[in-house]
From Swiss-Prot:
Lineage: Bacteria, Pseudomonadati, Pseudomonadota, Gammaproteobacteria, Enterobacterales
Protein name from the UniProt record: Type I restriction enzyme EcoAI specificity subunit
An annotated GO BP: DNA restriction-modification system
Pfam families, per the entry: Methylase_S
Protein family: Belongs to the type-I restriction system S methylase family.
UniProt remark on domains: Contains two DNA recognition domains, each specifying recognition of one of the two defined components of the target sequence.
The encoding gene: hsdS
Length: 589
């Protein structure tokens, strides 16, 4: 099967095999790895160095003759004293050859055709040369790089030397695995100096095609072999020089090398086009989803909401086909819930204004009993502060009027022990749950000194640390398995007056964009922590308790549906990834 047919016949697999990145990027497509196109690039590269990308021509001068000419030029360099004479090199054994070569090709090694890590001597210390740190070396297939200008005297020691025409690969992890490699060109005065984390090769002859050698250094087989040979500790592993200079290289006739480079460049350009089309399509799809979902939250009444939802539901199967689109749907459901648009209001429900009266009565009683201090009146809420209009029976209030916030205690680190009472820190709070992987304790007998900081089942705690990332605020509901534990500083506990708000509805509000934007509008400014005063001042849409229950029931039902849909999408995506892998393996083997 030709490469063109392989691409065209399986276009859907190459373009639909997507992988979600762990780190966020710009737009929805910035969080997506185009796995299928990545595998297609790797396949084209591997076919190139195995002699399967272009047909062989029996009229080409065989690689054996090319290697003889290179050996002759190498001998001349030795004769001129430009390089040292090498010891006789052992033949490449059959066991070392990873695959079978086409007719006219030969196995060779870098040490047979290039000088490894050559030195450069410059007589003028003031001479300007190119300086190339690792970040300026590209992972692209063209071997491109950038450089800074420095004087020779400033960089002649402690760095790697190279010149125009030299080829280099990164030897340290993860730069090696990411295929950072370069063909040096355009260097100031033809000379360069750079990071010590490079292996450099200077071909003995100008007839050697540098671009073809670069393809070898970027091929999946070379990278996989190099990774297996790395030495050193985790995070500091390096590909040894021995591997670089002795790993077998599949070497084609010179004319075929040139045809391979031309064809490879054409196919990479095609991959670039596919990649751009895929990214544009993904972004357009997500923008469409978010625009249509926006009509739901912007709906002025129940009738308009029903009309807008009908428009979306007609195209549900084509709209919600990615994990990002389902996440957007979940966030919209959450927004509708806190805006009072998810379930109809019941005029028979006790209005929120009555709940506020009960809260005021309970607070007055607690003050009378000396259990809490009398609170200064919180400022009235202006119309400008209100992010949206509330339904009948709801009331805007400040969180500080319905919750008392307790900040954690600043336990001293010298009190910490390996066993005892657990301390709940920021590190132990994830998004909705606790995480006890990294735990600190204080002695059990100290509990009586800190009774106010003892947490109970169903307490809600919130991290006061910035940054608040796009996935939402860090909060947790304390469960029985978390106990006993004490509250550490920079974590706050919500204490609800008169049990007027269910924990479930509060957590829905904490996840909403309205709350996140009110507590951290610039997505994390220079202030490292959120204060409990800020929490007290933020707004909360207080609603009838019966409606809270109806909303939570509906939310559970809809989120469960979203989770099922996301699972189906993930499963289908995994199948596409396996299919891309299988196609690649089948084409190579």
């Amino acid at each position: 099967m030709s490469v063109e047919k392989l691409i065209v016949d399986h276009m859907e697999t190459w373009t639909s095999a997507l992988q979600t990145r762990s780190t966020a990027g710009r737009g929805s497509s910035g969080k997506i790895d185009l796995y299928g196109i990545k595998k297609l690039r790797e396949l084209i590269l591997e076919l190139a160095v195995r002699g399967k990308l272009v047909p062989q021509d029996p009229n080409d001068e065989p690689a054996s003759e090319l290697l003889k000419r290179i050996a002759a030029e190498k001998a001349e360099l030795v004769k001129q004293g430009k390089i040292k004479k090498q010891k006789p090199l052992p033949e490449i054994s059959e066991e070392e050859k990873p695959f079978e070569l086409p007719d006219g090709w030969e196995w060779t090694t870098l040490t047979r055709i290039a000088e490894i890590n050559p030195k450069i001597d410059v007589s003028d210390d003031e001479q300007e040369i190119s300086f190339i740190p690792m970040p300026l070396i590209s992972t692209k297939f063209d071997g491109s790089h950038e450089f800074e200008i420095k004087k020779w005297k400033d960089v002649k020691k402690g760095y790697t030397h190279f010149a125009n025409g030299d080829i280099a690969i990164a030897k340290i992890t993860p730069c090696f695995e990411n295929s950072k490699a370069a063909i040096f060109s355009g260097l100031k005065n033809g000379i360069g100096v750079g990071t010590t984390e490079l292996h450099v090769a200077r071909p003995f002859s100008d007839i050697i095609n540098r671009k073809y050698l670069l393809l070898n250094f970027k091929s999946p087989n070379f990278l996989k072999s190099g990774e297996s040979q790395m030495t050193g500790s985790a995070g500091q592993k390096r590909v040894p020089r021995f591997f670089f200079e002795n790993n077998p290289i599949p070497f084609p006739p010179l004319q075929e090398q040139e045809r391979i480079i031309i064809r490879f460049t054409q196919l990479m350009s095609l991959c670039d086009q596919l990649e751009q089309q895929s990214l544009t399509s993904l972004d357009a799809h997500q923008q469409l989803v978010e625009t249509l979902l926006g009509t739901l939250t912007d709906s002025q009444n129940v009738e308009e909401l029903a009309e807008n939802w009908a428009r979306i539901s007609e195209h549900f199967d084509t709209l919600f086909t990615t994990e990002a689109s389902v996440d957007a749907l979940k966030q919209t459901i959450l927004q509708l819930a806190v805006m009072g648009k998810l379930v109809p209001q019941d005029p028979n429900d006790e209005p929120a204004s009555e709940l506020l009266k009960r809260i005021a009565q309970e607070k007055a009683q607690l003050v009378k009993e000396g259990k809490i201090k009398k609170q200064k009146p919180l400022p009235p809420i202006s119309d400008e502060e209100k992010p949206f209009e509330l339904p009948e029976g709801w009331e805007w209030c400040r969180l500080g009027s319905i919750y008392n916030f307790l900040n954690g205690y600043a336990f001293k680190s010298e009190w910490f022990t390996s066993v005892g009472l657990r301390l709940l820190r920021n590190a132990n709070i994830a998004h909705g749950v606790t995480n006890w992987k990294d735990v600190v304790h204080i002695p059990n007998d100290m509990i009586s000194d800190f009774e106010n900081y003892i947490l109970s089942e169903n307490d809600i705690v919130i991290s006061l640390d910035r940054p608040i990332i796009n996935t939402g605020l860090k909060y947790a509901i304390i469960s029985k398995s978390d106990l006993p534990c004490l509250l550490l500083q920079r974590v706050a506990k919500f204490k609800n007056y008169a049990n007027t708000v269910s924990n479930s509805f509060l957590t829905i509000w904490l996840q909403s964009y309205f709350f996140i934007n009110s507590i951290d509008p610039g997505r994390s400014n220079g202030v490292p922590h959120i204060s409990t005063k800020q929490l007290e001042m933020t707004l909360f849409p207080l609603l009838p308790q019966s409606e809270q229950d109806r909303i939570i029931s509906k939310m559970d039902e809809l989120i469960q549906t979203c989770n099922k849909l996301k699972y189906i999408i993930k499963t289908a995506k995994q199948t596409q990834l396996h299919l891309a892998d299988a196609l690649t393996d089948a084409a190579i083997n």
